[in-house]
Amino acid sequence: MKATQTLIATTKELPKEAVLISHQYMLKAGLIKKLASGIYTWMPLGLKVLQKIQNIVRDEMNKAGASELLLPSILPSELLQETHRWDKFGPELLKLHDRHNRDFCYGPTHEEPIVDMARDTIKSYKQLPLNLYQIQTKFRDEIRPRFGVMRAREFIMKDAYSFHENSQCLRNTYNTMYATYCNILDKIGLAYRPVKADTGAIGGDNSHEFQVLANAGEDIICYSNGSDYAANIELATYAKPDLSKRVNSQNTIEKIHTPNIKTIEKLYKEMSFDIKKTIKTMVIKDAGGNFFALVIRGDHELNETKINKLDQIIAPYTLATKEEIFSIFNANPGSLGIYNCPISIIADYSAIAITDLVCGANEDDYHFTNVNWDRDVTNYQIADIRNVVTGDISPDCKGTLELTNGIEVGHIFELEDVYSKPMNANIIGQDGKSKPMLMGCYGFGVSRVMAAAIEQSHDENGIIWPESIAPYQVAILPINYNKSDKVKEVADKLYQDLLGDGIDVLLDDRGARPGVMFADADLIGYSHHVVIGDKLLEQGLIEYKNRKTQEKQEITIAELIKILK
């Protein structure tokens, strides 16, 4: 492609809301242009990157035995009413009606239409397993769309849905899709981690997220430095301490005056207590109106997902109000503790491991020291209710846990019959009986992975793409292209030769100043820069720069061809 035949729309102007590097660089490089809040035009260079990602996704899905189809983007309300999602989805579901006043929505996801298609066309186990996918534009009416295409209202997603007779067949395809997603991200060239994830309202036992590692990631993921264990912070756990090794303390409980100390931070800073000897007692109320005291070590944080999954808790829970707490304890938050606690205690393993702990005295301005489990507090339950922290022992006891930020670009689930059962998507099984098909679903954020790639790899000058998805593999940057016949001749011939070799190349024939050409090339992120000028041509040389390493070399064209091949 010649630069004069496409639209290179680089700019220095940025809107105030562009806070992420990926958002800033996509706008500055002219990859996208904002049309409305959370809605973007894909400019030629941006679309080229997007199409390269789509091609990799499509190639790997096809290799995995999936078949592509295309579902409508506008969905009738009747389908979502079958699964009760017409009302449950909330304001993110963009609803509309046609001239006949029939209700429709812009598809935020496509479980219902794929099941509707399947129930009309799949009748027997002999047609299974079947894995179908699409690459489709979706719309979710986010209240505050932000971060550019990272969290846009309109986005492009690959969503696949598999159909099965039994759980083992579903698990086999799930494992195939897990490997396929790894292949996709490997082929793109991103650093990532598959992590065990919460299934949420969908339920089931199996769910994994695919997280691209990046400082700007909204998700926190943990992984072992000694094994392949990895999980989202919501689900991550740790090796439980051996409570049988606790030392029986001979120290007696002491009540101390702690005026105006209502936080753990003040307790260990002003009273010089070891924070790992302190505990936090927080009161919650579950959906059944039952109150519980949740106890964790002073330097730990509660994990909402784990708590809602406890058998004792009727989810969802809420934090008790100050008034509710005072009516139970006759004390305020910040002074609560486990000694003579009037409600059921659920304590984290790490809190249970402490001897001679420090806690509130259930009396304002007082704390107890030297409190011990089993000796002083006997009525309690133990559960994993906290977020893991760096240094925790991995649950497989291989290495310790480390935390990092990630951007979720893929999520796979075993849906089982969550959608097929209410929509009566049944087949005749091998036993001759009718039963709901089992399903898996596999989402991949095509437009999101583009932003994630930028977040993972960039510098102060612009984007450093993985070469597999760079808008152009090579940029020829001729100095005085429209003034020097020799420069034009060499640049044009090299351009044609590279095209003939199947190399994706851009010839910057705009006649722009060298500084403008070089700045645009760095900003847009072409993988290889070839500078052609009269001075070097006199020596039979051109200048080559690798965008990723910034290494520059003065080499011959023959040497350049070897590098590019």
From Swiss-Prot:
GO BP terms: prolyl-tRNA aminoacylation
Pfam families recorded: HGTP_anticodon (PF03129), tRNA-synt_2b (PF00587), tRNA_edit (PF04073)
Its EC number(s): 6.1.1.15
Highest rank taxon of the organism: Bacteria
CDD domains named among the record's database cross-references: ProRS-INS, ProRS_anticodon_short, ProRS_core_prok
Keyword list, A-Z: Aminoacyl-tRNA synthetase, ATP-binding, Cytoplasm, Ligase, Nucleotide-binding, Protein biosynthesis
Gene Ontology cellular-component annotations: cytosol
Alphabetical list of SUPFAM superfamilies matching this protein: Class II aaRS ABD-related, Class II aaRS and biotin synthetases, YbaK/ProRS associated domain
Subcellular location: Cytoplasm
Gene Ontology MF terms: aminoacyl-tRNA deacylase activity; ATP binding; proline-tRNA ligase activity
Reactions accelerated catalytically: tRNA(Pro) + L-proline + ATP = L-prolyl-tRNA(Pro) + AMP + diphosphate
UniProt xrefs under PROSITE patterns: AA_TRNA_LIGASE_II
InterPro entries reported for this sequence: aa-tRNA-synt_IIb, aa-tRNA-synth_II, aa-tRNA-synth_II/BPL/LPL, Anticodon-bd, Anticodon-bd_dom_sf, Pro-tRNA-ligase_IIa, Pro-tRNA-synth_IIa_bac-type, Pro-tRNA-Synthase_IIa_type1
Coarse class of the protein's main subcellular location: cytoplasm
Family the UniProt entry places it in: Belongs to the class-II aminoacyl-tRNA synthetase family. ProS type 1 subfamily.
Function per UniProt: Catalyzes the attachment of proline to tRNA(Pro) in a two-step reaction: proline is first activated by ATP to form Pro-AMP and then transferred to the acceptor end of tRNA(Pro). As ProRS can inadvertently accommodate and process non-cognate amino acids such as alanine and cysteine, to avoid such errors it has two additional distinct editing activities against alanine. One activity is designated as 'pretransfer' editing and involves the tRNA(Pro)-independent hydrolysis of activated Ala-AMP.
PANTHER family: MITOCHONDRIAL RIBOSOME PROTEIN L39/PROLYL-TRNA LIGASE FAMILY MEMBER, PROLINE--TRNA LIGASE
Domain notes: Consists of three domains: the N-terminal catalytic domain, the editing domain and the C-terminal anticodon-binding domain.
Quaternary structure and partners: Homodimer.
Protein name (Swiss-Prot/TrEMBL): Proline--tRNA ligase
Organism whose genome encodes this protein: Francisella tularensis subsp. mediasiatica (strain FSC147)
